[in-house]
């Protein structure tokens, strides 16, 4: 009698993971009381402050330093007026529970589905970017530019594979620490995956190089305006004072990350069976290398060369625009859409083939686009239930009165927890800094340490939080979350210990 083959257990997909998190958050809203901090924001139209009470009632006050002092908001008024602080800032000691009727079963079910649709609607700028990017990549693939490029590159990278990891990871980490390069790296996966596979590596190496690069960079932010700068301004401290420690920490963590990736990558290059994703080895090579023979000499047409040049220029313009002009996804999408039109014109393909290639490319990234929208639903449920401020208030009550070292370590863990629910760096900064920064004065430490705990805690949880960038990145390389965690958990322990040590050092040097 034939024995039945045991069915292999499969880890849930990214969609299911997000839905599970969404359900858990929704269940928490039945337990966690609703509450708000009062907030203060600058009205650019009327040139005055608008104070919003926890009840939602609003009133105006003069846009002066005296108004901020009255509310114990330790921020220079010019930071509001020049647009540096553009979000409502929480007012310390203003938390109040609000009388918000808890949802019944039907309302909860309705919110569960509605929040997902709202999440997709609110993420339309990022979704448009992802789909347009996919379309552009489809056109580049269709005219053979990528395969020809890989053939030309195959001989040049031979024996220099490690430099590829160092260069890519170093530049991405630099972008993360200086101007918050994060979601924009989605554009790099389709281009770098074939390059890394050609070098003998696997898709986990690509994920480690790109995602760890941006995660470490944004975690150890030095002059990132979306985290360190806005947190420093909200806390009322000069960010430049803490730069030596933060730069040192960034270099150490980036080098540690590089060593971790390189050791694994070289092991895989020498023996592909050592790959964490070896079960999809053939599938990945067939999908990304298209069975091309890279031993043949490259047959590069001028149309293919021009397509790659246009695509490369689009990347350069994107990075310049984000860093120098403060562009967001609408402007970036326009850049790649323009590049798509130009590549279509010079691709050498017929109109029908160009359109089909664009649609096929966009459809390949549709799953990533939907994941982005679903992840936003978690934040929507938190906002609608008014539980974020309650969680913040609870932790602020727990950490007051501790010794300096225990305080800053515990605060780091608090930000890891808060970062799971609030992935927006600027949003978490303006919500938490007015509450947490004054506690540093009570304990007797510099507020710069609080900013480090915020940055490093949020960045640390971003490495594994389903509400962050990781699930979208995993979908780009077709890797399950459990494989990612199995691969990176040792690095997580190392980075966690490094953060604790650096926070302790910060107490001595600030």
What are these regions (language model features)?
Residues 15-31, 130-138, 171-175, 217, ...:
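Hydrophobic core segments of alpha-helical transmembrane domains in multi-pass membrane transport
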């Amino acid at each position: 009698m034939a024995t039945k083959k045991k069915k292999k257990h499969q880890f849930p997909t990214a969609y299911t993971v997000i839905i599970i998190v969404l359900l858990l958050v929704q269940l928490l809203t039945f337990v966690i009381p609703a509450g708000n901090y009062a907030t203060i924001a600058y009205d650019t139209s009327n040139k005055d402050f608008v104070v919003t009470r926890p009840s939602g009632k609003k009133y105006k006050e003069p846009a002066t330093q005296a108004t901020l002092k009255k509310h114990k908001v330790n921020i220079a008024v010019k930071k509001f007026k020049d647009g540096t602080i553009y979000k409502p800032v929480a007012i310390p000691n203003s938390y109040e529970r609000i009388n918000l009727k808890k949802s019944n079963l039907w309302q909860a079910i309705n919110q569960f589905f509605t929040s997902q649709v709202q999440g997709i609607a609110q993420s339309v700028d990022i979704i448009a970017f992802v789909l347009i990017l996919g379309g552009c990549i489809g056109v580049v693939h269709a005219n053979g530019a990528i395969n020809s490029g890989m053939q030309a590159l195959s001989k040049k990278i031979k024996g220099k594979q490690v430099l590829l990891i160092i260069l890519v990871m170093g530049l991405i980490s630099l972008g993360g620490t200086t101007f918050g390069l994060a979601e924009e790296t989605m554009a790099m996966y389709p281009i770098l995956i074939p390059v890394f596979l050609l070098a003998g590596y696997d898709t986990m190496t690509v994920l480690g190089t790109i995602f760890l690069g941006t995660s470490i960079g944004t975690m150890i932010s030095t002059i990132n305006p979306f985290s360190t700068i806005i947190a420093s301004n909200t806390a009322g401290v000069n960010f430049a004072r803490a730069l030596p420690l933060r730069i040192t920490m960034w270099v150490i963590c980036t080098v540690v990350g590089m060593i971790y990736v390189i050791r694994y990558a070289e092991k895989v290059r020498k023996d592909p069976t050592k790959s964490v994703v070896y079960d999809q080895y053939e599938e990945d090579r067939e999908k990304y290398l298209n069975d091309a023979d890279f031993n043949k000499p490259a047959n590069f047409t001028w149309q293919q060369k021009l397509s790659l040049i246009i695509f490369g220029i689009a990347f350069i313009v994107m990075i310049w625009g984000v860093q120098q002009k403060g562009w967001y996804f609408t402007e970036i999408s326009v850049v790649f859409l323009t590049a798509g039109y130009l590549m279509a014109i010079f691709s050498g393909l017929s109109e029908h083939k160009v359109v089909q290639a664009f649609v096929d490319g966009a459809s390949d990234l549709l799953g990533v686009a939907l994941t982005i929208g679903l992840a936003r639903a978690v934040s929507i449920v938190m906002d609608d239930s008014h539980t974020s401020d309650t969680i913040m208030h609870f932790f602020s009550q727990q950490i007051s009165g501790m010794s300096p070292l225990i305080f800053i370590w515990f605060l780091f863990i608090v930000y890891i927890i808060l970062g799971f629910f609030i992935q927006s760096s600027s949003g978490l900064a303006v919500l938490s800094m007015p509450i947490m920064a004054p506690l540093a004065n009570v304990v007797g430490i510099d507020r710069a340490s609080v900013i480090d705990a915020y940055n490093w805690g949020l960045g640390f949880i971003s490495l594994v939080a389903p509400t962050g960038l990781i699930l979208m990145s995993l979908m780009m390389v077709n890797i399950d979350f459990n494989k990612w965690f199995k691969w990176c958990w040792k690095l997580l322990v190392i980075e966690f210990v490094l953060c604790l040590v650096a926070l302790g050092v910060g107490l001595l040097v600030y």
